[in-house]
Amino acid sequence: MTLREMLTAEKWDYVTIQQASPKSFKIETYRPYAQNLVDYIRRHAPQAEVVFHQTWAWREDHTRMGMDQKPRGFMYRELTKAYHTIAREVGIKRIIPVGDAFQLAAESPEWHFERDPDFDYENPKYPELPREKNSLNGGFRWMSRPGKAKETQPGPGAAQPDDGSDKVFYNDGSHANGAGSYLAACVWYEFFFHDDVRKITQNPAWLGDRAISLRAIAHQVASEGIKPAAWPEEIR
């Protein structure tokens, strides 16, 4: 299905757009493409409000693009400035503040992430993993080494190697984990339906009472306009 087919399939109330996460903090990557996309949407779905989805900053220890070497809060500040600047340029009036929610959570005592001090990250031993209680991102896991599975695929009935020789220790510090996805979902729900997510009384079994604090954070950014401490001064 093409974009045009999707835009004309129904009379949409909203169409949301976002920048790809690895480019989200580079404002030059939005131009002229954001304007072109918004113009296209408005041409084929003129009744819909175009809304920006503010993506989130990667976890502070994510090594991709050298992000772990940047000052704390760098990615959040830059992507926030980019979304708000481009929104003004293309005439988008509202931004879903998911990135604000992630940052506000990261600044809170309950969800501030610190690496496991007892884990040897330089010499990990398969299948051990660090404790990552407060992470909102995927975090560390063992993955099949690229190309290794095909090269060493055992025959029928053969045992799979269990010594980790076919695995690589990988940190997914960009994608949301279950807690991060729950937080984002709460922000989206309250943003669009104007219904206080703090009224929800049922918690996901795997998250338990910690869901309460995530709902509170979602309400703060979606309805109360609370900004993280790292919010860029340029757009205050």
Region roles according to the model:
Residues E190-R236:
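C-terminal accessory extensions appended to soluble enzyme cores
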Residues Q18, I92, V187, F191, ...:
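Generic hydrophobic/packing signal
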Residues E89, L183-C186, Q220:
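Charged/polar positions on well-ordered alpha helices
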Residues A179-H194:
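Short, hydrophobic/amphipathic alpha-helical patches that form generic packing surfaces
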Residues L3-G178, K199:
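Alpha-helical cap/lid subdomain in secreted, periplasmic
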